A protein has these predicted regions:
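Acidic, glycine-enriched active-site microenvironments
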Residues: 22-36, 40, 44-45, 54-60, ...
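Mixed-charge interfacial surface used for oligomerization/domain docking
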Residues: 137-141, 153-156, 160-287, 303, ...
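Glycine-rich oxoanion-binding loops at beta->alpha junctions
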Residues: 65-79, 83-90, 371-406
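Gly/Ser/Thr-rich loops at beta-strand to alpha-helix junctions
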Residues: 60-64, 99-104, 206-209, 289, ...
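Charge-rich, low-aromatic oligomerization/scaffolding segments with amphipathic character
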Residues: 296-313
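Short Gly/Thr/Asp-enriched flexible loops that form oxyanion-binding sites at enzyme active sites
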Residues: 100, 107-111, 416-438, 457-460
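Conserved short beta-strand edge segments in small beta-sheet-based binding/regulatory domains
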Residues: 281-282, 308-322
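N-terminal glycine-rich anion-binding loop in soluble enzyme alpha/beta folds
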Residues: 335-397
């Protein structure tokens, strides 16, 4: 209904406008401004697009993904009078910032539009129609298996009308308005293809493209010389369809951006097309972006690393996203990071969101727990000549995650890795402040002063309380309190990694190595890793851990504990059994340690985290 009203109002305005407003050609600045106007429409309709997202999977993020792609365009490109330069800049910014299936299709659409434009200041109507026709073909080419009744169908119908109509008008506004009318009719048809049981549903990506076109039409009609971007949210409930949460065939939405020389799309397609579905590859022989739904993102990235240099990657859990949309368990969202070492099934149970740290070996980098698994990490750790480096998620990563979560939760509590280990807390707080200001949602960030399983226990207890109905402010206070009630004990085997990570002086490490001593570390009250004691055998370290647990918790009630290990499940199981004898309860879980801990303490290390009631 909204689109019909928009179209009628614009048609009336056009009839009242003067012939002198005719626009027969456009330059780079006008092209840029029309894109900014289209982007603004995406921003305004972000929540709506999320709500009607049912294809290819119902993960409620099409609006977020398109908005992120548009933000990259708006914030990166500087308009030039030369239309070729501006078009190329728009395409490159879209490729760099594209997110999700629809974002990458849009990026390929812009690449197709820009790739054949000659060095020129302006573009006439016929040229515009011709280049947009090429753009439509390129959008189809990006998909391994194009599906009708989706975004690409609307793009094709719109572009075809431009080609048909450019012979009968010399005005850009009239041309775009006529084509918009065709795009709206095409949009109505998409529901027949994507949801036979829900005729009112339209494809979210296609709807996003139509919304973008509306912004372009408004710009050319208004004749404004500049366009200001304002944050806004409009939800048109008339467009919301029935729930139609089809089964998700592959769990992870996986993306990567590669650079190289003579990158071959067909070779890349054959390399990974059997590893999932919804494969989209956009870009040029020098820069390519891929999108695939898969159950094994770590295997996809392992293959892609051999194809070109990966400079960006993203993985999203669509099962978690779908569950959040259809079965939200709390009004407060809980966010942590991949250093929390919580098993996947528990993350699902409590709907805990995590944001990955990045780990790199030289030029190769990976997303902790997503594009590199603990066993892969240990293998690289032992073989690589270079020591791994961990880095925090970017400010944009946090901003995107908070923007997404605020569309589903009343407020958010983030509980993160010790600020002494990473600058993550600062990035999270900056993003939280900015998103809270624009959305009006309360977001609090807690420094747990902990890591690995100690952080995990804090996060799990916070999530459990949120599901139990605890209010936001009390939850934040309790989360801080619980972080002070947990202790971590880490038994190490190899001192090499302790030296490289700066946890031991070279002299002390040499002494430990000479006498084959196994160090035992603890976290102090400030979250610093401290050498507590040592033994000549790992099992003696375990006895000392038991002694420390008894010393600290003999007269206290234990809330729970967990065991972590670096590729040493046998020792972890043994430690679990001896701690169970002391406490009278099994561990909450036994889990592989995150790459951040593994890189610091080395293979075969084992740790226990324990929290008092």
């Amino acid at each position: 209904m909204y689109d019909v009203i928009f179209l009628l109002s614009l048609q009336i305005k056009l009839k009242l406008s003067h012939v002198s407003n005719t626009i027969s050609e456009i330059n780079g600045v006008q092209l840029y401004n029309s894109f900014v106007a289209g982007a603004q429409k995406i921003f305004e309709n972000q929540a709506l697009l999320n709500n009607i997202n049912f294809y290819p999977v119902p993960d409620a993020d099409t609006g977020t993904n398109l908005a992120s792609t548009m933000y990259s365009i708006v914030n990166t490109v500087k308009a030039e009078e030369n239309i070729q330069a501006t078009a190329l800049a728009l395409a490159d910014a879209a490729l760099m910032g594209a997110r999700g299936n629809s974002g990458i299709i849009f990026a390929q659409f812009l690449y197709g539009f820009s790739k054949d434009i000659k060095e020129q200041q302006t573009m006439n109507i016929k040229e515009f129609a011709t280049y947009m026709s090429v753009a439509s073909e390129c959008a189809y080419y990006a998909l391994a298996k194009p599906k009708e009744g989706t975004m690409i169908s609307v793009i094709k119908d719109w572009a075809n009308d431009l080609v048909d109509s450019c012979e009968t008008t010399d005005d850009f506004t009239t041309l775009l308005l006529n084509a918009l009318n065709v795009a709206m009719e095409s949009l109505k048809e998409t529901g027949k293809f994507i949801a036979a049981k829900a005729k009112t549903i339209v494809d979210a990506g296609a709807k996003g493209f139509v919304v973008f076109l509306e912004g372009m039409c408004e710009y050319f009609h208004s004749g404004e010389k500049t366009v200001q971007v304002a944050n806004a949210e409009i939800i048109d409930s008339e467009w919301l369809g029935e729930d139609n949460h089809e089964d998700i065939t592959f769990r992870y939405c996986t993306e990567a951006l590669m650079i190289g020389e003579d990158l071959d799309k067909n070779k890349l397609t054959s390399l990974i097309e059997t590893m999932g579905d919804c494969l989209v590859i956009a870009g040029s022989p020098r820069k390519m972006r891929l999108h695939i739904h898969t159950d094994y993102p770590w295997e996809v990235l392992e293959k892609v690393q051999t194809f070109g240099r990966v400079v960006y990657q993203k993985v999203e859990d669509m099962v978690m996203q779908n569950d959040l949309v259809s079965n939200r368990k709390s009004k407060i969202g809980i966010l942590s990071d991949s250093a929390c070492d919580i098993p996947k099934e528990m993350l699902e149970k409590y709907q805990i969101q995590t944001i990955p740290l990045t780990v790199s070996f030289g030029d190769e980098f990976y997303l902790d727990q997503l594009t590199i698994k603990p066993k892969q990490f240990v293998e690289k750790l032992e073989k690589s000549a270079e020591m791994p480096r961990s880095s925090q998620p970017s400010l944009m990563d946090f901003t995107n995650r908070y923007n997404y979560l605020t569309t589903h939760y009343d407020s958010i509590v983030s509980v993160h890795l010790n600020g002494k280990f990473s600058g993550m807390i600062n990035s999270s707080r900056k993003a939280a402040t900015a998103v809270s200001k624009t959305t009006g949602k309360k977001i609090d960030v807690v420094d747990s002063h902990n890591a690995t399983g100690a952080l995990g226990l804090c996060v799990l207890r916070t999530a459990e309380a949120a599901i139990g109905g605890m209010e936001h402010d009390e939850l934040v206070a309790k989360s801080i309190e619980w972080s002070e009630k947990v202790k971590l004990f880490v038994s190490c085997v190899n001192t090499k990694y302790l030296i490289n990570s700066g946890r031991l002086s070279t002299f002390r490490a040499m002494m430990l190595k000479l006498f084959k001593i196994k160090p035992l570390f603890t976290l102090d009250s400030e979250g610093e890793l401290q050498l507590g004691t040592f033994s000549f055998r790992t099992k003696d370290n375990f006895k000392k851990i038991l002694g420390l647990i008894k010393e600290n918790y003999e007269h206290k009630k234990i809330w729970n504990y967990c065991i972590m290990h670096v590729d040493n499940p046998e020792a972890a199981q043994y430690l679990s059994e001896v701690v169970e004898k002391l406490t009278g309860r099994k561990p909450l879980y036994i889990e592989d340690a995150c790459t951040m801990l593994a890189g610091k303490v080395g293979p075969k290390a084992v740790a226990v985290a324990i929290m008092e009631e």
